[in-house]
């Protein structure tokens, strides 16, 4: 077993997180380790592509676009001594997210529109990391707005960008260049890269706030 980052390992060729919990989305469980499926989680894909985050485990994380909690569940395994504010706007996936929250004490579910951070500003404290996976045209505006409200100075962001959600007619590479340029004024880019073969026409961007 090879350790990749806090509570994240390669078990033979399978990515897993160390966990005291059972399966959340049908993933396999191996004696205290949960399979982390890269085709179901862009963060898992990023890690398998070779980029890792240096997390202590006690961070406060704002997760924008939590959906039904697939990636949230693994991130909660990693920051097991911290807190994840999980924001999701759609009611149906939020119901599944609530199932996860019932057995975890480090996830706070928030049924809000991530483009309106002022609506949950009375709940969310300053965070060390913003993780965003929102397939909307204005996703960089959403990231900047939330960073302004919640991200600590020199806090980190990880955003998953789907080219077709921003401009379905442009070449993905042109969309990605535009997104990176849009981020430059507010963030220092640490690393960006493709999520192929796991997610087509997607990139990850890891950055920190000036």
From Swiss-Prot:
Residues binding S-adenosyl-L-methionine, per UniProt: 70-71, 88-89, 113-114, 133-136
GO BP terms: box C/D sno(s)RNA 3'-end processing; tRNA processing
Gene3D superfamilies (alphabetical): Phosphorylase Kinase, domain 1, Vaccinia Virus protein VP39
Alphabetized CDD domains for the sequence: AdoMet_MTases
EC number: 2.1.1.-
GO molecular function: histone H2AQ104 methyltransferase activity; RNA binding; rRNA methyltransferase activity
SUPFAM superfamilies xref list: S-adenosyl-L-methionine-dependent methyltransferases
Pfam families per the UniProt record, alphabetical: Fibrillarin
Result of changing residue 89 to A: Strongly reduced RNA methyltransferase activity. Reduced affinity for S-adenosyl-L-methionine
Annotated family: Belongs to the methyltransferase superfamily. Fibrillarin family.
The protein's role, per its UniProt record: Involved in pre-rRNA and tRNA processing. Utilizes the methyl donor S-adenosyl-L-methionine to catalyze the site-specific 2'-hydroxyl methylation of ribose moieties in rRNA and tRNA. Site specificity is provided by a guide RNA that base pairs with the substrate. Methylation occurs at a characteristic distance from the sequence involved in base pairing with the guide RNA.
PANTHER family, A to Z: FIBRILLARIN, RRNA 2-O-METHYLTRANSFERASE FIBRILLARIN
Subunit structure: Interacts with nop5. Component of box C/D small ribonucleoprotein (sRNP) particles that contain rpl7ae, FlpA and nop5, plus a guide RNA.
Protein name: Fibrillarin-like rRNA/tRNA 2'-O-methyltransferase
Source organism: Archaeoglobus fulgidus (strain ATCC 49558 / DSM 4304 / JCM 9628 / NBRC 100126 / VC-16)
